[in-house]
């Protein structure tokens, strides 16, 4: 209610789609995982989140190794997702094959799939905490190798922000730098 005249529209989509919307001036800004240089888009690193394994059956403990994850049924996003790319890279480096039993983009569908106990998912810590609470499940930090994703604020490179968009950006930056943020939920990117 700090800015009652501003309406925020949230779009959940891949970084590529969001960047395209920025370039075409359909969005003022986007917060995405794992930015890559894109012509026409400026990017500012915000945070880094560790990746966690989330499930409801047979908790592996506070931390889990990729070798153990290779034995589990996985629900992962499609192969263009930053999470999927990071998981595929970790498995490839260890010459392991992931047992992907479903590719799920929707949080509601992923929540139902994890609640069913049929498999586990790899998620950034903030999403893992939320999903874990929703399904009364567990979360384990992926430690060998440790995996994380950086979160970036992307803006159109050649456009000035409207006063409303600038206010939203400033509010976002103040929330990110706030000492009130839950310990270990977010880590500043160095």
Where are these regions (language model features)?
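Beta-alpha-beta core module
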Residues: 38-49, 62-64, 108-157
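Active-site-adjacent beta-strand anchor residues
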Residues: 11-12, 76-77, 103, 121, ...
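Proline-centered flexible-loop/turn and helix-kink motifs
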Residues: 1-4, 96, 143, 184
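Flexible hinge/capping segments at coil-to-helix
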Residues: 40-79
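Secondary-structure junction motif
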Residues: 73-94, 161-165, 169, 175-187
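Central regulatory/effector-binding core of bacterial HTH transcription factors
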Residues: 1-39, 104
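Residues at or immediately flanking beta-strands
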Residues: 3-9, 97-101, 150-152
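Conserved functional loop/turn residues at catalytic and ligand-binding sites
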Residues: 7, 21, 25-26, 45, ...
């Amino acid at each position: 209610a700090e800015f009652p005249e501003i309406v925020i529209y949230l779009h959940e989509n891949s970084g590529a789609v969001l960047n395209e919307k920025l370039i075409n001036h359909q969005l003022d800004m986007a917060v995405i995982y794992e930015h890559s240089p894109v012509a026409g888009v400026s990017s500012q690193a915000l945070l880094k989140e560790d990746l966690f394994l989330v499930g409801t059956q047979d908790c592996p403990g506070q931390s889990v190794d990729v070798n153990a994850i290779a034995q589990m049924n996985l629900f992962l996003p499609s192969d263009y997702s930053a999470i999927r790319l990071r998981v595929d890279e970790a498995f490839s480096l260890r010459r392991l094959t992931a047992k992907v039993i479903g590719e799920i983009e929707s949080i509601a569908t992923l929540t139902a799939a994890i609640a069913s106990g049929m498999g586990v998912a790899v998620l950034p810590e903030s999403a893992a905490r939320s999903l874990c609470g929703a399904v009364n499940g567990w979360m384990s930090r992926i430690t060998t190798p440790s995996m994380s994703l950086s979160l970036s604020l992307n803006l159109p490179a050649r456009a000035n922000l409207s006063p409303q968009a600038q206010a939203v950006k400033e509010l976002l930056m103040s929330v990110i730098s706030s000492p009130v943020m839950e310990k270990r939920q977010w880590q500043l990117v160095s």
